[in-house]
């Protein structure tokens, strides 16, 4: 029997309601006696950045069941994808032995581990010797374990001497990092998921929480159900399922959200809803050029964003601007939540700053339920990459490449000679693949990510990956990943709970995934692979003197010690016993930190500090309200391409479907990509629901089935990117935010016609 998406979503909604009412999660159903696990092994869900705790049921050495961990923050709940992880783990579609392509255009064929590692080491070593260390690169992932990203970062920055270390968090979270750092001086949210249970107003902007973070959405919905007076404002050009529980849905014109938030600030100040007691003591003001200003300067700046003017720009009712501002400011505790709709923009950092501005001008921050909280898309983008410094401009624990003091600290911690870490940042993601296409980067390791599917302007990327001098190594579990078409060497990793390691989720919580089952075939833990590769490539053996992932974790704890990321107290033994700990956690008896920057709660704030709040990432302890200009997108619609095109998520799939595509229930529910079209736009072009249409941009054209509905606002079309047969990222431009270098997936110009 075929399953329609509508039926599937009905089933999901019904199941979610039952699960929420009963306290049970997906996957906690009764099991047949002959399939009952002999043991349950603790871990973390392999999908989004919510970081739900799971228990994997094992019998006869095989994973047979999964359920939510009742002791973790998700309280035993899992989303549908998480509840169906076991078929992914047990899939027969796995890379189980090393594969080599002996010449460009040839086929991948089996090779021994010894030959594979020797080939890999010799190619990297010879490239470094002939062309210098910047001819090699690592492209990692927010799906790698913390220990894997740490070892790779150490090998490349400390061993090879190149900062060409980047990864897919550049595509999703770099603007959030830039926003936190420029506003507060340090990355990562100050609150936790527990704030959801205390908030009385939710400002959700650029996030389809219901489909991208379903467990958190259920928690928000439950909060509204328990206390109906809680206000939910959803600002999104699409009328998503998230918006359907909102008290107010602001469907602004794409790219005008910065003006909308400035206008909210205008209302707050002009109606005296701001909190002078807070901002006078804890905030500095900076103008558009980054020069010091003051409250009066900010107030004058906002005169350009009066609600009546901005309502016309955004094409929303002016009452929504006033209503959203009042609800935000007058609430006892307001929590903002955002994701890719804010981050994946050429104004992504500025947009993040403006959310923080609203919290700072109202004092809606650093209290239970009052926080600005960026949602994360991958299970370890925060812990392994952001905290671990595995991007081209970063070093571990909040250190930065351009900072000489930080470089010296890491050289000492890693036992390196002075000056070993290069002072210039390496290539960010888009520039890295451009360098590959020019032949400047010769050798690259791509680990647990699928850039030949996910990067923008893919035709350009595919050409770069086909460079005749390139040598691309993929550490990849699934053979249908598009990137393997461009790989010269493929190494099979142990996947998820086939090895042990730590994931760090969006609320600063680090949780241990324990090994539950053995990997198939010749698959190996990636930590072991990287250590052996480094030794064969001539890296000092003492630099990678790790026997296992626990050795790596203990070194990483030491590197964090004494920093504002301090998690020295998170021993492996504690992580085995507890269901996650939230940093800072500087000692083994420390419970973890729910509220950062608060005296008496954050161990990084001195106990005798005279102020209640101390934003210690800034020299004077004050956060910053920025007067960021509300600029447009890199590519706006015009007469030739009159529509906005944006990317979107579907609840059934995650990223490039290399995992969800292995689950029949998920694949049947949404087997192919499509384009969402508003009813007005469809009527104007003669397109009906189900018609085959051509979506075209300045980069490429693609044939897709049309879904005609009221989800997109008029003038906007949307496509999901999960389908490997429809690589829709060929359509998007690769313009990047000038601060974060995150690409603009959310806005470009397009046109559509019947095929």
Curated annotation (Swiss-Prot):
Post-translational modification remark: Predicted to be exported by the Tat system. The position of the signal peptide cleavage has been experimentally proven.
Activity control summary: Activated by potassium and sodium ions and inhibited by magnesium and calcium ions.
Enzyme class (EC, first level): oxidoreductase
EC number(s) per entry: 1.9.6.1
Principal location class: periplasm
Signal peptide location: 1-32
Key words, A-Z: 4Fe-4S, Electron transport, Iron, Iron-sulfur, Metal-binding, Molybdenum, Nitrate assimilation, Oxidoreductase, Periplasm, Signal, Transport
Amino-acid positions noted as binding Mo-bis(molybdopterin guanine dinucleotide) in the UniProt annotation, renumbered to this chain: 81, 143, 168, 172, 208-212, 236-238, 255-257, 340, 344, 450, 475-477, 647-656, 729, 746
Catalytic activity: 2 Fe(II)-[cytochrome] + nitrate + 2 H(+) = 2 Fe(III)-[cytochrome] + nitrite + H2O
InterPro entries: Asp_de-COase-like_dom_sf, CT_Nitrate-R-NapA-like, MoPterin_dinucl-bd_dom, Mopterin_OxRdtase, Mopterin_OxRdtase_4Fe-4S_dom, Periplasm_NO3_reductase_lsu, Prok_molybdopt-oxidoreductase, TAT_signal
UniProt cofactor note: Binds 1 [4Fe-4S] cluster.
Required cofactor names: [4Fe-4S] cluster; Mo-bis(molybdopterin guanine dinucleotide)
Binding site for [4Fe-4S] cluster: 45, 48, 52, 79
Biological role stated in the UniProt entry: Catalytic subunit of the periplasmic nitrate reductase complex NapAB. Receives electrons from NapB and catalyzes the reduction of nitrate to nitrite.
Family designation: Belongs to the prokaryotic molybdopterin-containing oxidoreductase family. NasA/NapA/NarB subfamily.
Quaternary structure and interacting proteins, as annotated: Monomer. Component of the periplasmic nitrate reductase NapAB complex composed of NapA and NapB.
This protein's name: Periplasmic nitrate reductase
Species the sequence originates in: Desulfovibrio desulfuricans (strain ATCC 27774 / DSM 6949 / MB)
Gene: napA
